[in-house]
A protein has these predicted regions:
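C-terminal transmembrane helix and the adjacent membrane-cytosol boundary/short C-terminal tail
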Residues: 117-130, 135, 142, 146-147, ...
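Transmembrane-helix boundary motif in ABC transporter permease subunits
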Residues: 35-66, 128, 141, 148, ...
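Membrane-interfacial helix termini and adjacent extracytoplasmic/periplasmic loops
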Residues: 2-13, 20, 77-108, 177-181
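Periplasmic/extracellular loop-to-transmembrane helix junction in inner-membrane transport proteins
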Residues: 1-37, 53-56, 148, 197-200
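Interhelical loop and adjacent transmembrane-helix boundary motif
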Residues: 15-17, 177-220
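Transmembrane alpha-helices
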Residues: 118-119, 127, 141-176, 222
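Hydrophobic alpha-helical elements at and bordering transmembrane segments
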Residues: 22, 26, 30, 62, ...
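Hydrophobic alpha-helical transmembrane segments of multipass integral membrane proteins
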Residues: 31-43, 47, 73, 145, ...
């Protein structure tokens, strides 16, 4: 009990003093996770919109595959990407392994299905009358798509927030592809695992407090925008 209390008190001091080590770790986490979220959004939103808006053969199968990928373990993604970017892999000459770029690639693969699936759900919830009204008023296909996209904007924002919340807390991909290098590829989750192994509970708890605060904020934002879709 004393260990927990002492660690918690020391952790609060570290957070309040903006410890350089913590600032560096949080900065790496936000940079890598933020970049992967932007890339996944640029790919996943158009993909999800196309799947929801268009009618084509195999549409149900594509949606099923995306839903299946939502449960894909991070270690599987890490292993898959590692096989491509390791020295013996196809992309070995690019020297991507144990870099932030490798982490971004893995994290993008992780959350791309999340963005696409949530976008599909957001588009599918839009009343069909919006499409029919737009067509009746003489809107072309592009203008109709814009109307649907505008009405689904809150659901799409919720998709991006959910993706960021998923990726900021992952550890498997960051550990396998980043290598947990101090000041370069060490994220909050990998640092917590390392500090726990070293017995440095204060830093681990401090990072846990920050991560918990981020998760709480992300969840509040997610439910806010998700609620907007019901208005």
């Amino acid at each position: 009990m004393d260990l927990l209390a002492d660690s918690f008190f020391s952790a609060l001091l570290l957070v309040a003093s903006f410890d350089p080590e913590i600032v560096s770790i949080v900065a790496v986490s936000l940079k890598v996770s933020g970049t992967s979220t932007v890339i996944a959004s640029l790919m996943g939103i158009p993909l999800g919109f196309f799947i929801a808006f268009e009618s084509f053969a195999g549409k149900r199968m594509v949606i099923t595959c995306l839903n299946t990928l939502l449960a894909l373990p991070t270690v599987v993604i890490g292993l898959f990407v590692y096989a491509f970017i390791s020295r013996r892999g196809i992309l070995g000459p690019l020297d991507l392994l144990y870099t932030q770029k490798a982490m971004i690639i893995g994290q993008t693969i992780l959350i791309l299905p999340i963005v696409a699936t949530f976008t599909i759900a957001a588009i599918s919830r839009i009343d069909e009358r919006y499409r029919k009204t737009a067509i009746t008023l003489g809107a072309n296909r592009r203008q109709t798509a814009f109307v649907i996209l505008r009405e689904a904007r809150f659901g799409i924002v919720a998709a991006v927030i959910a993706a960021f919340g998923r990726v900021i807390a992952e550890v498997g991909i960051s550990m396998m592809l980043g290598g947990n290098a101090r000041g370069f590829t060490r994220t909050m989750t990998t640092a917590m695992a390392l500090e726990y192994d070293k017995g440095q509970f204060a830093l681990a708890v401090a990072l846990g407090i920050i991560l918990l605060g981020l998760s709480f904020t992300i969840n509040l934002m997610f439910h806010f925008f998700q609620g907007k879709t019901r208005i």
